[in-house]
Amino acid sequence: MTDSQQDYQTIRCRSTADFLAALPQLAGFTATDSLFVVLFTGAQAERAVRFDLPSSEEPSESTRLLDLVCDILSEVGAAGDPDAAPALVISSALSFKEAGGTPWRRLARRIERRFRRERIGLRELCCIAPDGWVSYIESGAPQHGHPISEIEASPVALEALVNGD
């Protein structure tokens, strides 16, 4: 193996909880009040990009973020290519309880509308908060989220613990 080659571990995610358990390994770190955009080629995650969340969900606060994300996704060829559809994670310091429901729901809806307009598919759009997680695109998603324990009990999280990741 040359210095430029690396051993990559394949992580198989079968659910959103698995994907959220894998996010720290995919991104290389965790952060709250962030939007993670995970880029894909087919079923393979390629890289992750992190952005600070805006100070509020007001359109005037989030337009610049949406412009930047869409520009990047267009540059990498995600527009019009279902195999390149990204997965987005809103990592929130605001809990479901504090938000009175799903945190950052308005921003998520703006992302969905903008992606439709730009012809960018969505592999996943979800939120992780201190007291739960939810997929915004899951029909019938619980208003107060799924328990964090579902991520912690994910085979992906358990494997990371065993491997010391």
Q: Residues of each region from the PLM?
A:
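Short hydrophobic alpha-helical segments used for membrane anchoring or interfacial signaling
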Residues: 38-41
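Charged, compositionally biased boundary regions
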Residues: 2-33, 46, 51-165
